[in-house]
Amino acid sequence: MNDLKKSPLLILDFGSQYTQLIARRVREMGVYCEIYPYHINHEQFKKLNPCGVILSGGPSTVTHDANPRAPQWLFDSGLPLLGICYGMQTMAVQLGGQVHSSALREFGYAELRLHGHSQLLNNIEDRILADGSALLDVWMSHGDKVTELPPGFKIICETRNAPIAGMADESRQMYGLQFHPEVTHTLQGLRILQRFVVDICKASTDWTPEHIIDEAINKIREQVGTEKVLLGLSGGVDSSVVAALLHRAIGEQLVCVFVDTGLLRLNEAEQVLSMFGRHMGIRIIAVNAEDKFLTALKGVTCPEEKRKIIGRTFIEVFDEEAQKLTEIKWLAQGTIYPDVIESAATSTNDAAVVIKSHHNVGGLPDTLNLKLLEPIRELFKDEVRQVGLELGLPHDMVYRHPFPGPGLGVRILAEVKKEYADILRKADAIFIEELHNAQLYHKISQAFAVFLPVKSVGVMGDGRRYDYVICLRAVETVDFMTAHWSQLPWDFLGKVSNRIINEVEGVSRVTYDISGKPPATIEWE
């Protein structure tokens, strides 16, 4: 098999919130692509040997000279180019066209009328009018617009407010689209991207789960040889897929450490040990560190501080176990491509605000002196799941809802105590069980329970009592950047509430969170 990463498609990032979505759409076609900052070095670009380039959108305006531009040498590369939104505008300006701020901005749905023939949009339409005009339903998000074409370009589509909504120089295979083909609101968006990537760029479509696994196994064996590898196994999707992949590649050379923090979901430790230890035969060192974590968290209520303490304590426990394993030479991690993109700071926003600390950011101590192995660092989450299924992991494990690294520690809105964790664990398990029973679990993106540190009066039998409040949260989202609260049936919520109040001692009231993201985040802390 040829190198899957030979001649990738490149996406140059101008800071759009949709840049990773472009890459995911391209990967869905079976095409390998990578994201780089818009100011990529020319030598690095040449070494990558791309088959084509997409210029992403971005929050800036090309009407200011100081704002980002594509490298000028890119337009002399001879490669097919597609500019999306800001990418189209900077292409237009840099090649001699004009862009101005528009009095009529376009945000949201727009009806697009195609102009004549273009290789990019030919025979792609949502409907055709009686006069033969082809129309597309697209998603716009722009305040500037191209007002004058660069030399050699023609108009390929228009909207009521943007007479130049798309442009093309067919001879140089350069294209610009003012709308966003990568979002699902543009109904034919995937076909448009596929036309550019596969038909115009002639990209290879060998990027499939089977080929990804084959290449990863070969690379792991080549890197590791006969040496042993250590993996921190959490039971999450990423570390589970890494465990299965490494086990297939190197068998008994893999050693896993599983840390029970006391902040896991109900029966989670037993499920992980059963699946990977007894069922798959992987060597797992299980550490019950509940007391250590609860002691470290005593008296702490600040969410950010809780995250840092949980992360620091995890590293201490893991380090202590790793130091006992003198034969280990490699440390495996479940780093995935979005982590790589963020840590490489490909975003054009230099001043980033820390919204929440992630417990595993920063890695393990240098004193371990281990070589790093990251076998899924080039995969998006949806690709990780596909690889997991191909490796034979259970569907319910691979498509389990996201669970935060700090676990229940950030779903207890107070000091973390064993009493609170036990209450929350049971309530959460009931919620998830009922979602499965009602066949709703896989229709929503994430669901969980939150422990609220307030007591509410309740009536149990003939007596009044004050007990704690549980809040249920369920959201639907495509990318977790924005989310809608899930409109679960009232009778379903009533059933869950009754079960929690009757079966979980210490709970007198259950509420349901109907906040979207934004303004709220998905997790409460």
UniProtKB/Swiss-Prot annotation:
Keyword Ligase among UniProt keywords: yes
Q: Where is the GMPS ATP-PPase domain?
A: 207-400
Q: In which pathway does it act?
A: Purine metabolism; GMP biosynthesis; GMP from XMP (L-Gln route): step 1/1
Q: Which UniProt keywords apply?
A: ATP-binding, Glutamine amidotransferase, GMP biosynthesis, Ligase, Nucleotide-binding, Purine biosynthesis
Question: Any idea which GO molecular function terms this record carries?
Answer: ATP binding; GMP synthase activity
Which InterPro entries does the entry link to? Class_I_gatase-like, GATASE, GMP_synth_C, GMP_synth_GATase, GMP_synthase, GMPS_ATP_PPase_dom, NAD/GMP_synthase, Rossmann-like_a/b/a_fold
Cellular component GO terms held in the UniProt record: cytosol
List the active-site residues: C85, H180, E182
Q: Where does ATP bind?
A: S234, G235, G236, V237, D238, S239, S240
EC number(s) per UniProt? 6.3.5.2
Q: Which Pfam families match?
A: GATase, GMP_synt_C, NAD_synthase
**SUPFAM superfamilies per the record?**
Adenine nucleotide alpha hydrolases-like, Class I glutamine amidotransferase-like, GMP synthetase C-terminal dimerisation domain
Tell me what reaction this enzyme catalyses. Answer: XMP + L-glutamine + ATP + H2O = GMP + L-glutamate + AMP + diphosphate + 2 H(+)
Q: How does it assemble?
A: Homodimer.
Matching PANTHER family:
GMP SYNTHASE [GLUTAMINE-HYDROLYZING], GMP SYNTHASE-RELATED
Protein name per Swiss-Prot or TrEMBL: GMP synthase [glutamine-hydrolyzing]
